[in-house]
Structures are given as structure tokens and as C-alpha cells.
């Protein structure tokens, strides 16, 4: 799938998907100076409590490592399934399986049983075992430890997470500007590409974006605008943080797309359509589709504009809503049967056919101060 979307009302828990991806990457890549990676990346996360705050949560992800070649047994498809089950104090389970041409093979399993870890390694596992097991703390990932020791199997998944999974920041503040600064310094030729990207979205008054230094001597993103008046065409410049929130977000999306257009990446964007016009939103998706690099865009949003006809495949759209116990339930659009080819998914969603709509009720502000007087 080139693109995929999770759509639902505010407060439905859509973003828990993104937070889980961030948590896994944070735990696996935690530096040595972080005393307890589990507490740092699972604390205050709604998905992390399982059936209670003291019981482990479980996160599992499938990673396509190799598409393989159909009919060629020497080049099978390989899907890595990495799973963690942990509280903020320790791992209770950690496992890596490879699904090779549909056949599930264990690489490693780590389980907490009777106060100690029990390990199991498959015959296809390549890497250090006994010494790595003996030294591993309860709050550290075996995948990380094995990869840093050069373990071939662990390194395949570790390298994929490092190089290909990218969760985009919201796109407004200093973190977003740093991403853009780093991209422009590494790829100065992208400056003109960003301008062209903005022009494609009808932002036509910008003619230059570059790295400059502000009054304090610090690097910042400088944006040059032009305008027409009675004297002719004139120009003025602004820094990134003085631009509108929507323009900052578009520039960040542009550089993240360029990364994905240059090498295979998985871009995950939360609140994708925030501050963006629906037409701009859909055209951004079309721009991503038009590129031939085998990268993937996964977005989370409230905006039903993503349901416009022929924008995304049915099996790439998921709806999110709160269940009876306030847990988030995800349902694929492809699970709904009887949808006619000519039927508008967009209209059907707004009519409530697929659920995942906000349930509204009346609200009346109670001015208690006035009532008491």
C-alpha cells in the first residue's frame, strides 16, 4: 500500500497507534544515559496499561523486510513480526518472528517466568546468545542489545526501524524547524523544490527558502516573499517562526516527502490535515502517490476529505472509534460488505454508515457567579 489512513472523531484514540510506534522506537533506541527506557516511553500513555496500570501492555508490529519474487523459492517474501509486552518496570515478553513465504519461524523469544527470563532461539537466528542474555537488564530490549553487538538477525530489524520509520513532528515549533534546517543543510538543492511544492498547492508568493542567521547569530529558516503593488514587484523576508502555522506545517511535510522520494521510508503523520484546506490535503496525497519510490505514507486524521473517491484504496482506510469500555476500536473499510462501486465513501461516512463519527449533545454554560448575584 502506498498510503494508508486512520480516520475518526476527536478523542477516539486514533493517535494511540502513532504513540505506540514512537514508544517501540524510543525503547529500542534508548541511549545508555536513560535509566529506564520503559518508564520514559510508556509513562502516561493510555495504550500502555493493558487491563490495569500494573499489568503489561502489548505492542506488535509487522515489518516487510523483503517482498521476494513470486514463484522463486530462493527469494522468499520476509515479514518480521516484532512484539513487546511490558510494564514501566520490566519486559514480560519480547519476541521476533520471521514469516517466510507465509511460514512463521521463531528468531528469538524472551519471557519472564517465575522471577527470571526464559529464552528460546530458532535455528534461523544469527547472533550472540548466552553472553547477551546474561548481561541484559529487565528494562532493556534484547533486540537493541543483540543489534549493538552485531547480531545479524536483530540488526536487520534494528536497521529498518532506524532508517525507514519516521514519525513526523506536529510542524510548528523549534523541533520542526530543526528538521527543516538539517534537511536544507544536507540537501541545499531542496530549497527550490520546496518552493515548487508550495506553488503546486497555490502558495505562490514565496520565491526562496534558505538557511540564514538571525539577529542572535543562530541558524534559522529564512523565507522570502514577493508582492505586487503600484510600484511593481517588491520582496520581504521572514523567519520560520514568524510564518503562519499552516505554512510551517507544509514546509515540514515537503522535506519529509523529499526524504521519502529519495530513499524508501515509512512516514507517519498524526493530525495530518490540521490547518490544511481539504483540497490541499487531497492534493498532497496525490503528490505522494505520483512518486515512484516505494515509500509509504500513513496518516491519522479527523478530516473525511481523505475518503474522496479514488484517492486511497479501500483496504488502506481504517476507522477508529471508542468502544463500550472506552478502548479504541479499529475497523477496516474493506470489512464493510455490499458497498457499490459508484457509492460515495465520503458521503456514506458523513451519513454514519461506517460509524466513527462524533456523538453530539447539547451544552449550556452555567454562569454560577451571575446566578449567585
Model-derived features: where do they sit?
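Conserved lysine of the Walker
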Residues: 14
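C-terminal lobe/lid and adjacent interdomain/linker elements of RecA-like ASCE P-loop ATPase modules
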Residues: 263, 283-373
